[in-house]
């Protein structure tokens, strides 16, 4: 992800603003312009997450924002937990919870097991201009919700960016959807 700072503009800045607002840090209107209110929200987020409060969104800040950006949280199984209870407390379906945690046995949850809890919001944020970085975040978010998806490199573009593919299953029939755009 690109490094953002006071004065940055564009879809990644808008995504940052929407994410900060969603998790309780008032970045103001999500207009794609990194102004004073966004700067203050970034400082507050950094302080809350033991990151040096520079107001610059650099890799350490992006890493701390990853669960909110990608739409998941982690939950450690406690005594008395069931998948139904965990799903209900997080306002998601048991199906979504089991899809994100293949191999977890619903009838015998082990205390201390760390589960991925997907959020109920859409992976795609429809009111942000689509760009390469957002496409990559969307692929990562899908992989978290559906670990069976295989993300792979199909090569590099003329602009030297990775061209990603996603395999959703295996079988006798192969279907290719091309979503390239310039």
Regions found by a protein language model. Name each.
Residues 35, 58, 160:
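Short, conserved phosphate/pyrophosphate- and ester-handling motifs at nucleotide-, phospho-/glycolipid
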Residues 53-69:
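Alpha-helical interaction/regulatory segments in DNA maintenance proteins
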Residues 18-29, 33-52, 78-111:
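LysM (lysin motif) carbohydrate-binding repeats in extracellular/periplasmic proteins that recognize
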Residues 69-80, 84-106, 110-182:
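M14 metallocarboxypeptidase catalytic domain recognition
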Residues 1-32, 68, 75-78:
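Acidic, Ser/Thr/Pro/Gly-enriched interdomain connector segments
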């Amino acid at each position: 992800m690109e490094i953002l700072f006071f004065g940055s503009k564009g879809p990644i800045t808008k995504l940052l603003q929407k994410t900060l607002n969603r998790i309780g840090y008032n970045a103001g209107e999500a207009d794609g312009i990194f102004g004073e209110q966004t700067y203050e929200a970034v400082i507050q987020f950094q302080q809350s997450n033991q990151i040096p409060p520079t107001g610059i969104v650099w890799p350490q800040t992006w890493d701390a924002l990853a669960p909110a950006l990608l739409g998941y949280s982690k939950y450690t199984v406690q005594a008395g937990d069931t998948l139904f209870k965990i799903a209900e407390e997080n306002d998601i379906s048991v199906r979504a919870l089991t899809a994100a945690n293949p191999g977890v046995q619903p009838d015998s949850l082990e205390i201390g097991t760390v589960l991925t809890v997907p959020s109920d919001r859409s992976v795609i944020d429809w009111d942000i201009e689509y760009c390469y970085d957002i496409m990559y975040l969307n692929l990562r978010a899908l992989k978290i919700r559906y670990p069976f998806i295989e993300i792979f490199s199909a090569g590099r573009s003329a602009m030297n960016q990775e061209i990603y593919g996603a395999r959703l299953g295996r079988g006798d029939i192969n279907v290719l959807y091309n979503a390239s755009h310039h």
